[in-house]
Amino acid sequence: MSRYRGPRVRIIRRLGALPGLTSKTPQLKSNSINQSASNKKISQYRIRLEEKQKLRFHYGITERQLLKYVRIARKAKGSTGQVLLQLLEMRLDNILFRLGMAPTIPGARQLVNHRHILVNDRIVNIPSYRCKPQDFITIKERQKSQGIIVKNMDLSQKYKIPNHLTFNSLEKKGLVNQILDRESIGLKINELLVVEYYSRQA
């Protein structure tokens, strides 16, 4: 399944606020779920599916990519759900978004693809690049690159930078301090339901 490129408002009407996808927050339609015994299995599946879709659309990844992350998380020590969130949060495109250097994760991905971003003084053009503690992120020394980031930062001022990251606004430099904890996730999600959804596939 390819990455979603359709109307973003339609997605957040169905799934709720997804700040990585869009800053818009339209009113949600009331959606009553039939709680009868005959529909119980269907509704439980739907709940798990929607939690999985939240992760996909928020982080802007394909179904295949998400399944790959789930498989990696299953092999790691600790809670599978928490490790999954950490893997997604440490992607370079998401780090740029959380630092306020891009208004959305698709916007951050574009910065990386267009070679505006350096990690540890080296250009990285892979949005899925996995950042690690003590990595520092800077902007290419070009007027165009600098101008794009400054404009993005003005748009992103309403978001608070999480504790596992630091941003020096004068030097336009971000630092990954540590692996984030569960409380720093910028998305309302029940990751255990996502793990359950993939229990037969991963």
Swiss-Prot record:
Stored Gene3D superfamilies: Ribosomal Protein S4 Delta 41, Chain A, domain 1, RNA-binding S4 domain
Classification via PROSITE patterns: RIBOSOMAL_S4, S4
GO BP annotation list: ribosomal small subunit biogenesis; translation
Pfam families xrefs: Ribosomal_S4 (PF00163), S4 (PF01479)
MF (Gene Ontology): rRNA binding; structural constituent of ribosome
Chief location bin: plastid
Localization, UniProt: Plastid, Chloroplast
UniProt xrefs under InterPro entries: Ribosomal_uS4, Ribosomal_uS4_bac-type, Ribosomal_uS4_CS, Ribosomal_uS4_N, S4_RNA-bd, S4_RNA-bd_sf
Recorded GO CC terms: chloroplast; small ribosomal subunit
Keyword set, alphabetical order: Chloroplast, Plastid, Ribonucleoprotein, Ribosomal protein, RNA-binding, rRNA-binding
Family named by the database record: Belongs to the universal ribosomal protein uS4 family.
Purpose of the protein: One of the primary rRNA binding proteins, it binds directly to 16S rRNA where it nucleates assembly of the body of the 30S subunit.
Name of the protein: Small ribosomal subunit protein uS4c
Native source organism of the sequence: Diphyscium foliosum
Taxonomic lineage of the native organism: Eukaryota, Viridiplantae, Streptophyta, Embryophyta, Bryophyta
